[in-house]
Amino acid sequence: MRKGDFSMIYFDNAATTRQKPNEVVQAVTEALCLLGNAGRGAHEATLQASRTIYDTRRKLAEFFHAESPERMVFTGNATESLNIAIKGLLNPGDHVITTQLEHNSVLRPLYEMEEKGVELTIVKADVQGRCSIADMEAAIRPETKAIICTHGSNVTGNLVDIAAIGAMTQKYGILF
């Protein structure tokens, strides 16, 4: 078989979707070409950039049921967001639950926080690569502050039932 004799089928869409939708390409192109640095002046391009950012914050706040658009923060990428959230949320003495399915972008900051006194429980996956919600619930302690887990594993392709975990964490007053 030679190159070109077959078409590629791309399966790793959990984090790194290869083909971006046309709307994403168009929005990035517009952002690169219009050059309206938000918050850097009072000319029309700057004001339009500021409106676009605020409108995006408003839509995200609505989608995530946040208190206000000002609660929405943009970062350079998901890894940066995870580091900010994990390191900003956890303190020595806190307990956090995660799963064996997590990506290094989650595990590395959790291990770093563990070295600083955060207690970490890693829920094991079964032979099919699934984590039991009952096992997560059994790991909850009075000092459990959060459950941090992926929705879709880029290793197994399995989805985690985040609706059930969300309901459980609400019941216990734990962040998710």
Task: Enumerate the predicted regions with their spans.
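Pyridoxal 5′-phosphate
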Residues: 1-176
